[in-house]
Amino acid sequence: MDIKMDNFTTPSAASLESDCDLYAHHHTARILMPLHYSIVFIIGLVGNLLALIVIIQNRKKINSTTLYSTNLVISDILFTTALPTRIAYYALGFDWRIGDALCRITALVFYINTYAGVNFMTCLSIDRFFAVVHPLRYNKIKRIEHAKCICIFVWILVFGQTLPLLINPMSKQEAERTTCMEYPNFEETKSLPWILLGACFIGYVLPLVIILICYSQICCKLFKTAKQNPLTEKSGVNKKALNTIIFIIVVFVVCFTPYHVAIIQHMIKKLRLPGLLECSQRHSFQISLHFTVCLMNFNCCMDPFIYFFACKGYKRKVMKMLKRQVSVSISSAVRSAPEENSREMTETQMMIHSKSLNGK
């Protein structure tokens, strides 16, 4: 396969390919990217574990919204477990030293988190749409039964889309490094622009349209309810719901839009200019990918905040857990203080007694 590709590669293109360093920014990236992903790892893991603990403690009160949220939390936790290897990779200047098998697994976890997260956020918006706009069409029991089937379907769909990553090599030996899960590693894939454009439409554009339609309908319903019943507006329930909706949409757009826009515009450029793009264009795209992927991965840190502000029970439980932890720390400190003073007094008395014996 390599021989055939070499036959179709002109000498000028080959020299351009070899002279183009797409990782020239590694000196800056090896500082900023590990720092960013370390923050994502800590906040994402702690926040999502807290959310999972609260959900497990309230499993008897589970509903369709909680079910989708649980799967979203599991997806985020799964992603954070793969971050230490990525942090090491970026800290070494885009050099993967632990084999292609682990590289493939990391890539699998990354894409599972990305598109499982998008799908479950879409499911949440549809679920809220039926709960608020059409509450009589599906009762609570039916929504839970459907939610279980939908969650299973989403995981099967995402695994089906990402499992081919385990078949294809994800790492590539460069002159100075071994890269992992980088775009140039599979740039020669046949019909890649069309594959990525299709993935962007199914994995981003379609979910975004569904989310915007669902939440806009929910907002209209809330405004209509507020006009019919002024007490709901005075209670502040509608305002809180609207603020939560705005927050969810902003998080989705800010985290996922830049990455998919970067992919779409570069793939369109490749289709319009089938030949090898200039090195500066390719390098700019590579930098934009690293930046937008960092932004997209930050989404797993924002999900716990959505639960915190949107779910009254979750907020109350978290605050209760934190208060309990603080009270335990204070009580242990108070208990240890007299013990410390008593121990110091005993040691002082022993020293005095020892000196008096020596004096004799």
Swiss-Prot record:
**Domain of life (superkingdom):** Eukaryota
- The entry annotates sugar attachment on N7
Chain segments annotated as transmembrane = 31-56, 77-94, 105-126, 149-167, 192-214, 241-264, 287-311
Disulfide bridge positions per record: C103-C180
| Residues in the Cytoplasmic compartment per record | 57-76, 127-148, 215-240, 312-360
KW Phosphoprotein (keyword) present: yes
Query: Which Pfam families does the UniProt entry name for this protein?
Result: 7tm_1 (PF00001)
Keyword line: Adaptive immunity, Cell membrane, Disulfide bond, G-protein coupled receptor, Glycoprotein, Immunity, Membrane, Phosphoprotein, Receptor, Transducer, Transmembrane, Transmembrane helix
Which protein, by its recorded name, is this? Answer: G-protein coupled receptor 183
